[in-house]
Amino acid sequence: NLFKNSKDYSNQRTGKTESRLPEIVKNIALIYVQKGENDNAIAAIKEARAVNPDDVNLILSEADLYIKIGDKNKFKELMQQAVEKDPTNAILYYNLGVINGEQGEFKIAKEFYLKALELDSSYSATYLNLVGLILEGEGPIVEKMNKLVTSRKASDMKKYDELEKDRVNLYQECLPYLEKLIEIDPTNIEALKTAKNIYYTIDDIDNFKLMNIKLQELEN
């Protein structure tokens, strides 16, 4: 599950004892979901929210419920409500990045991931997802290149070279995030392999060798 659950949400207010109501209601709703009684689960959350409409934890409990029953549009709507009430919580922006990315809204997803990093630059999953999002653009470029690779027409060769530049630019865009991810999580094999392949493609042999060494050390 790529989403961060509401239990990971931390309310930054101090000097107040947090109500246990959101967690209790969430557990009741979960029991209903496990029994296949989704309508009762939704009703339980909505009843609690009617009493405390501004409680961010209740909003997140409702969002968790909708992701469990597969309603991603409602999840996104609730996460946006949560962001409006707590605009400095990085996890909320991260979740919005995930859901928008899954729905093909890559530009919007990227904006949410960047906002999440602005608020919390230490969360490795945000970097990983952002790199993956940027590299989504590689597929269409490679597909076009493959159609031109055997052509000897000057115009096609020129198009191929332009596409190759676009591909390199894509790699250059994601490298800072990938390098930061490796700095935060140096044992992330997926990140190391991706960096290794990118360095090889852009002819950065020194860093290619460095990634190779790191991978060999981890695999041994």
Question: Where are the regions that the model predicts?
Answer:
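Canonical positions in the second alpha-helix
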Residues: 48, 81-82, 115-116, 181, ...
